[in-house]
C-alpha cells in the first residue's frame, strides 16, 4: 500500500482522472450511436426514414455545399436587407475589436499611473475610459441588434421559401400520404428552421470576431514579441482544432436524432388533442399515457446520452481550447522577458518592462481566447451540420414531390390475393389524365393505393353530367381511393382518366373542414372576400345558400357575416354538414363527391338538398347507405372489397340495399 501511495500525487491523479473521463467518453459515444437501434424492442412510431440512406451530418465538403445552397435562399441578392445586416454586423465586429485593443492599452496606462503614483496620468486615462463607455456600449448593442434582426430575416426568407414549396398544389398532402421520407414536417418547418437560422448567425459572429481578433493581435504582437509567438499559437490552433473536430463528429448525428425524437413526441401530443373525444369515449387515457411515456422515454434517454457526451466534450474542450492555450500563451509571451540577452529589453526600466508585459500579455491572452473560441466554434459547426442535413433533406423531398416523384415502400404483388401476381409492376404516374368538361370516364384504370396495394385491377365506367352515381360497398373496398384518384391526390398507375379540371370537381367529406375566420369564410372557402366580389356574388345570395340548407337562422344567431368564432366547436355536427353543402352551392362545380356528408342531417332536409343539386346542374357521386337516396341517382357502382365491381343503371327492378 505504501509503495502504491507514493504514485498518488496530485499531478498523477489529475492525469488518471482525465484518462478515465476520456475512456468514458469513447465508451458512451459508442453506446449512444447504437443505443436506439438495439435497445428499443418496439418499432418507431413513424418509420419514415430509410435505414439505408442516412443523412450525413459531419463538417465536410457536402455540408459546405448544402449550407451554400441554403444561404442563397436566405441572401437572394447582393443588395438586400440581409446583406445590410451582414455588413452592419461586420462593421460592429471590427469596431468591437478595436474597442478591445483600445481598452487593453488604456487599461494598461491606468494601471501604470496607479503603480507609478501619477495622479495626473491616472485621472486622464480614467476620464478617457469614462468618455468612451457610451460609444463602446453602443457598439456592443448595435452588434446584438444586428444579430437578432439577421436571425429573424433569415428565418422569414427560409420559412417563406419552404412554405411556398410545401403548399404548392397538393405537396402538403403528398408528403404525409404518398412519401415516407419525412416524419413530422411541422417540426422541420418550425423548430428546426428557427434553430438552423440562429445557429448560422451565431456561427457567423463566433467565427468572424475571433478571426478579426487574431489578425489584429498578430499584427500588434509581431512588432512587440516577434513572429515566433503568434506562429506558435496558430500551430497549436491547427493541431487542437483537427483533434477536437475528429472527436465531435457524433454531434451532428445526435442532433438529427434529437430533432427526430422531439418531432415524434410533439406528434403523439397533437394526436391526443386531435382525437381527444374518441379517446375519451373509449376511456383510453391509460393506453395513451403509455404511448406518450414510451415516446418521451426514448427522447429522455437520447438527451441523457447527448448531455453526457457534451459534458465529456466540454471537459476536453476546456483543457485544450482554454487552459492549454493559456499555457502556450504564457510560454510564448515570457520568452523575450526571460531571455536576458533579448535586444528589445536590454535597456528597459522596470516600469517599462511591466507596461510592455501587461500590454503584450493581455493581447496574447485575448489572442489565445480568440483561438479557443474558433476551436469551440467547431462544436457549433458540427451541430449546425445536423440541422443543415435535415433542412436539405426537406428541400429535396419538396422538390421531388413538386416534380411528381415520391418514394414509398411498395407492397409485394405476391402478398396479394387479387389476380395481380402475374400483372406487370405498377408504376406511379403511368396513367394518363385527360381534362374534359361534363364527363368522368375511367378507362382500364387500376385502382391502387400509393404503396401499390391493388383494390381493383381494371376499373372502367363512364358518367356524363346529369347522371348521378351512388357508390356502395364494405369498408376498405376502394370508395375513398376512387375519390382520391379523381381528385388527383393519388397517382394514376395506368389506363386513362377523363375528367374536368380540379376546380370543377368538389369534395364534401363526412366531417367537413371549418376554416379559421368569419362566418362568410365558412361558406366561400377556399375563396376570400375579394374572390366573392369578383364572382359577383352578394351577401344576399350567400344568405340564399344558407336558406337552401335550412341554416338561415345562423346568420342572426352568430352576429352576422363578419363574426369570428371557433366554428368547429360552435356548429353542431349537422350544422357543419349543411354548411359544407352551402359551400357546394356557392362553388357550383360540374361534379361533386358526397362522402357520407348528410349522415347527421334529417331525411327531409337531405331530400331537399339533393333535389336542389339537380336543379342547379351539379352531378353527384354519393357514398351512402341510406335507401332514401337511391331515387336521386341514375347509376350505382358497387365494390365487393375483393377486387370486383359492378356499374349498372338503376331501374325499377334494381334491389336497393342499405338502411
Swiss-Prot record:
Domain ABC transmembrane type-1: 85-372
Transmembrane feature ranges: 84-104, 126-146, 224-244, 313-333
Residue list for modification N6-acetyllysine: 61, 260, 399, 533
Reaction(s) catalysed (UniProt annotation): a very long-chain fatty acyl-CoA + H2O = a very long-chain fatty acid + CoA + H(+); a very long-chain fatty acid(in) + ATP + H2O = a very long-chain fatty acid(out) + ADP + phosphate + H(+); a long-chain fatty acyl-CoA + H2O = a long-chain fatty acid + CoA + H(+); a long-chain fatty acid(in) + ATP + H2O = a long-chain fatty acid(out) + ADP + phosphate + H(+)
Post-translational modification as stated in the protein's UniProt record: Ubiquitinated by PEX2 during pexophagy in response to starvation, leading to its degradation.
Glycosylation, residue list: 12, 106, 206
InterPro entries: AAA+_ATPase, ABC1_TM_dom, ABC1_TM_sf, ABC_transporter-like_ATP-bd, ABC_transporter-like_CS, ABC_transporter_sub-D, FA_transporter, P-loop_NTPase
Pfam families: ABC_membrane_2 (PF06472), ABC_tran (PF00005)
PROSITE patterns on file: ABC_TM1F (PS50929), ABC_TRANSPORTER_1 (PS00211), ABC_TRANSPORTER_2 (PS50893)
Signal peptide as annotated in the record: none
Classification via Gene3D superfamilies: ABC transporter type 1, transmembrane domain (1.20.1560.10), P-loop containing nucleotide triphosphate hydrolases (3.40.50.300)
Subcellular compartments: Peroxisome membrane
Enzyme Commission numbers on file: 3.1.2.-, 7.6.2.-
Positions annotated to bind ATP: 473-480
Family recorded in the similarity comment: Belongs to the ABC transporter superfamily. ABCD family. Peroxisomal fatty acyl CoA transporter (TC 3.A.1.203) subfamily.
NCBIfam families xrefs: 3a01203 (TIGR00954)
Subunit structure, as described in the record: Homodimers. Can form heterodimers with ABCD1 and ABCD2. Dimerization is necessary to form an active transporter. Interacts with PEX19; mediates the targeting of ABCD3 to peroxisomes.
Protein name per UniProt: ATP-binding cassette sub-family D member 3
Organism: Rattus norvegicus
